[in-house]
From Swiss-Prot:
A divalent metal cation binds at D97. Substrate binds at G74, D75, Q76, I77, R96. It catalyses: 4-hydroxy-4-methyl-2-oxoglutarate = 2 pyruvate; oxaloacetate + H(+) = pyruvate + CO2. It comes from Xanthomonas euvesicatoria pv. vesicatoria (strain 85-10). Keywords: Lyase, Metal-binding. Its cofactor is a divalent metal cation. NCBIfam families: NOT-MenG (TIGR01935), PRK09372.1 (NF006875), PRK12487.1 (NF009134). This is Putative 4-hydroxy-4-methyl-2-oxoglutarate aldolase. The keyword Transferase does not apply. Pfam families: RraA-like.
Length: 166
């Protein structure tokens, strides 16, 4: 089933829409799935760990606290995410290796690109509610993203009268 975030907003006017801060870096611009969240600052240890675990079509939401000094996602972690079935990654921070990210079948949204990697200090919190871009991102809630924007909903959104979901 095809969908767009404008169609979802028209059908579900109560969805929460993120401020338009993010750029697409991945090879897939439309993606959706239940969220797994990470809160970290200039340390992608948890992002790396999660990318190596089964994604099962989920979306990894990373609150990097808006830091533009270090990239929280690069080609190796993104390739792990693809291999393990993640639908996409939304990062309130930076990515790197953007030419390679663009070739991967993964949704990747971030604030910007930065060539500097993080230092891994084994820091970060997983499955905690985070808030950025004017949106509360809650583990298990659903994220929908495409070229028009990002929205979140507490459950999968049905597009037909029969209760089917995306």
């Amino acid at each position: 089933m095809t969908w767009t975030t404008p169609d979802l907003c028209d059908r579900y006017p109560d969805v929460t829409i993120a401020e338009p801060l993010f750029r697409h870096f991945g090879g897939r611009t439309a993606f959706a799935g239940p969220m797994v969240t990470v809160r970290c600052f200039e340390d992608n240890s948890r992002v790396r760990e999660l990318s190596a675990m089964p994604g099962d079509g989920r979306v990894l939401v990373v609150d990097g606290q808006g830091s533009l000094k270090h990239a929280l996602l690069g080609d190796q972690i993104a390739a792990n995410a693809v291999a393990n079935g993640w639908a996409g990654v939304l990062i309130h921070g930076c990515v790197r290796d953007v030419e390679i990210l663009a070739t991967l079948p993964l949704g990747v949204l971030a604030l910007a690109a930065c060539p500097r990697r993080t230092e891994r200090r084994d820091l970060g919190d997983v499955d905690v509610a985070v808030n950025f871009a004017g949106v509360p991102f809650v583990p298990g809630h659903w994220l929908y993203a495409d070229a028009n924007g990002v929205l979140v909903a507490p459950q999968p959104l049905a597009l037909d009268g029969a209760g089917g979901s995306i």
